Amino acid sequence: MAFQFSDQHIEDFHMLGYTVFGKILPPSLISDLRQVSNVARKIARERGGPQVQRLQPVGHFDLDQQPFIDYAELPVLVDAVAKVLTPDHHHGDRDDFGILLEPAEMPYCTAWHRDWRDNIHGLNLEHWNQGLLDINLFNQINCALYNDSCTWIVPGSHLRHDLRSEVERFPDRPIPGPNLEGKTTEEREYTCLTYCSRMPGAVQLHL
């Protein structure tokens, strides 16, 4: 069944902090995006090695830009974003967005974080606190081109500051990532899964 927008998408986004537009991309566009992403992966690994995790922004590299343009202008996606946020919100800026890549050799996971607060060095935290509920901030779209279960989220956490249970589990800010030094592939997999699942209230998304 093709994608159908519903009020549930709006409710999920504003209450949980995320919503899933299942089957919103046509197969032909997925194919085009996969092909250009294969080229992007090669470029990224030539520049940053086999463990590199992104190429960004896509508009600054020698890539076929048409699939990204088609993605940005896809009417059903443009409409869905406008309904969940506002008609003034847009996605697909090729001078900004990137392609996330799976590391080639060893498993890895990103540290638990709140966007900008925990991963932008020197950010004015008072400004971050003031913008916590600003609908124009902290939004992102993740477009999975393959079955993807690597994203973890704490539903509803976008509406509040850290809970006591979260601080007790991870007392340092920014939260450090897991220690993967010297571990085998299998040990890394186990360590990363344990790290992600131990955040209180965390759920794993399946895209």
Identify the meaning behind each predicted range.
Residues 98-106, 116-117, 143-150, 157-160:
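Short acidic/polar capping segments at secondary-structure boundaries
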Residues 18-20, 203:
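Residue-level preference for the first positions of well-ordered beta-strands
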Residues 15-16, 200:
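Structured helix-beta-strand junction loops
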Residues 132-138, 144-207:
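Double-stranded beta-helix
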Residues 1-15, 22-127:
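Non-heme Fe(II)-dependent double-stranded beta-helix
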Residues 18, 71, 89-91, 108, ...:
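Sequence-level detector for tyrosine residue identity
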